[in-house]
Amino acid sequence: MAVGTSALSKEPWWTLPENFHSPMVFHMEEDQEELIFGLDDTYLRCIELHSHTLIQLERCFTATGQTRVTVVGPPMAKQWLLLMFHCVGSQDSKCHARGLKMLERVRSQPLTNDDLVTSVSLPPYTGD
């Protein structure tokens, strides 16, 4: 995205076809899913609303109890969530703390363009 362009459109994100072109799909451990989305996915809807995304959780019947996570929405919002998911699951205490702070942010209030731009401008974490 070019500097000076808006990360979040003034139009509802779900009305823009480009937000559905490249869904983000990955697997998450069951305990991490519960930490992020809460017991019985209590926080799923508010995370979707606050991150301007749609998140689908599909429990997989595997030995490790993984969940397939599919996210659609504005590219920078998906990138922000991916960073948050990574940090929450990190073994590094600083990265994990950063992820928990991001999680509290997205649970408590809508993400702003500043949130999205700030998170993608941070240096990538390479400690895991």
UniProtKB/Swiss-Prot annotation:
An example molecular function term from Gene Ontology annotations: RNA binding
Membership in a protein family: Belongs to the KHDC1 family.
GO cellular component: cytoplasm
PANTHER family: DEVELOPMENT PLURPOTENCY-ASSOCIATED PROTEIN 1/5 FAMILY MEMBER (PTHR31368), KHDC1-LIKE PROTEIN-RELATED (PTHR31368:SF5)
Organism lineage string: Eukaryota, Metazoa, Chordata, Craniata, Vertebrata
Protein name: KHDC1-like protein
Record InterPro entries: KH_dom_type_1_sf (IPR036612), MOEP19_KH-like (IPR031952)
Signal peptide: none
Transmembrane segments: none
